[in-house]
């Protein structure tokens, strides 16, 4: 389904005319023609609407490289965080189609952080990817690509707008690693140990030698608040010890924090066991 956006384009009669023609072509499922009209629209005047719709039209045709470029352009031109979040989410959706699920999840989660009321399709897409990768090993290259996008790519250019229209500081780069402890314990399973080995290899690279990292442990929502806080701290400590043991150069550069159940990805007591598992996670912030 080709969903036209509510126009945010300033006065630009020629660009608007081509944009309207593109919407008509899209509604008729003629996405190739829609792209042609949208290319003419952005030639007349750059606009968020035209670039975002071009991303959707290219995505529909599985022209993934072109779709990623269009969504990136749209994000740069977004009039507000809400619009930027939608384009970032579509960018993530396109990455998933390209097999880059870990990087896709990074995009979708950032979009949900930015949007005041994320549409259900963003949440559902993120959850499905989350479920698909939770039992999969994470490669060093996936972690590096995710960080590169946050530090030098699309997300590096995203700022939250303040009331006066200026830009605030960027959000710290972060990595989220699925972790699986034995129930009510701090014992790491084999997959988590392998994922931490990939994480440690990245954090110990020369490019990060002057950086410190904050490890934040999260629990599921079962149990008392204080108990979960203590458990998350203990788990973060266990992860710190695992990393330092295998990567001594990280000693003294890791800070730990237990978030307990304060920031669940999936809220409520009556959620599935899979959702409880996804709430148990490690976030790594680069300071």
Model-found features: residue ranges?
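Start-of-helix register in tetratricopeptide repeats
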Residues: 16, 49-50, 83-86, 120-121
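Residue-level recognition of tetratricopeptide repeat
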Residues: 23, 56, 90-93
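Periplasmic peptidoglycan-binding/tethering modules of Gram-negative envelope proteins
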Residues: 102-212
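Periplasmic OmpA-like peptidoglycan-binding domain that tethers envelope proteins to the cell wall
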Residues: 218-287
